[in-house]
Regions:
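His/Asp/Glu-enriched, well-ordered alpha-helical/loop segment
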Residues: 1-92
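C-terminal cap of metal-dependent C-N hydrolases
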Residues: 80-135
Length: 136
């Protein structure tokens, strides 16, 4: 199993959202190549390594749980609930929907992965209990 970790010893940030964003950037660099002396089509030997936001989110949740053998990371009956409630902090939040915009679920998740910040986290739940939140 493969997952993303967000503890400080495993990376530079503790945010699961930032970890997912860094995975997107790293995968894009690997897929696109980084040698400026080569033409874009000749830069990469790994074009299939690109990761989308849905995959990055899965790696940061269910993938991480699977890699560690933990019974979390999914909304299923009988499974422990470790979750965060994400609500746009205000109208200027990067995750606030545009007026009249009707987004597909994958697009909404992409917006969350790319834009969620601490100010957007309303509540944190560990094992089903509310433990904290940026706006508590």
């Amino acid at each position: 199993p493969v997952g993303l970790g967000s503890d400080i010893s495993g990376g530079p940030v503790s945010s699961v959202w930032e970890t997912a964003r860094l995975a997107l950037v790293a995968a894009r660099l690997r897929a696109s190549g980084t040698d400026p002396d080569l033409a874009p089509e000749a830069r990469s030997h790994h074009p299939g390594d690109r990761v989308d936001a849905v995959t990055a989110f899965w790696l940061a949740t269910a993938g991480g749980a699977d890699a560690l053998g933990l019974d979390v990371g999914r909304f299923r009956p009988g499974q422990r609930l470790d979750a965060i409630l994400v609500v746009p902090g205000d109208d200027t939040s990067a995750i606030a929907p545009w007026p009249g915009e009707d987004e597909a679920p994958a697009r909404r998740l992409e917006r969350l992965v790319h834009g969620t910040s601490r100010a957007d986290i309303a509540d944190v739940f560990v094992d089903g209990r509310r433990v904290s939140g940026a706006r508590r």
